[in-house]
Amino acid sequence: MKKKVLFISSTGGHLNELLQLSCLFEKYDYHIITEKDKVNEHLKETYGEKIDFLPYGTRAKLFTYIFKYLYLCIKTVYYYFKLRPKVIVTTGTHTAGPMCILGKIFGSKIIYIETFANTNKKTATGRLIYPIADLFIVQWEEMLKIYPKAVYGGSIY
């Protein structure tokens, strides 16, 4: 029986980084969760039942973002208990935060990959997940100074 692994990220560059790990999908009972937007709707055709979407939220409209984020948290609880992953792999950002916290509470292993785009400072999600991650991977050696318990994994690309 294959280990259940959840791959989760927000849309855009974070999702692009996450999908670089697709060579791992066949090794696990995998599932992907990302934000739904027009750019990645086609992924349902590629991954079928192996992908689900959370609401896309932008902080540009703070009032609506608060409600969307609350809804995202509720959907996160639903997906976590539906999937019950043993491992959660994420490249960030806010979409992944609630899932990683929930996963940690219920015993999932957390693997966080800090974004390739950041070479010299902590990201907001990195700050949140670093203390609870079972494995925290950085893509730039310079980031080991900022995250001393991290592992340098090289570029995901």
Write out the residue ranges for each language-model feature.
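An amphipathic, basic-hydrophobic alpha-helix
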Residues: 62-86
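Short His-centered aromatic/hydrophobic patch
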Residues: 91-95
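Active-site-proximal region of nucleotide-activated glycan assembly enzymes
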Residues: 108-157
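Conserved nucleotide-sugar phosphate-binding/catalytic loop shared by glycosyltransferases and other
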Residues: 9, 29-68, 142, 153-156
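Short amphipathic alpha-helix
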Residues: 14-26, 46
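Glycosyltransferases and closely related glycan-assembly transferases
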Residues: 77-87, 97-111, 128
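Extreme N-terminal starter segment of soluble prokaryotic enzymes
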Residues: 1-5
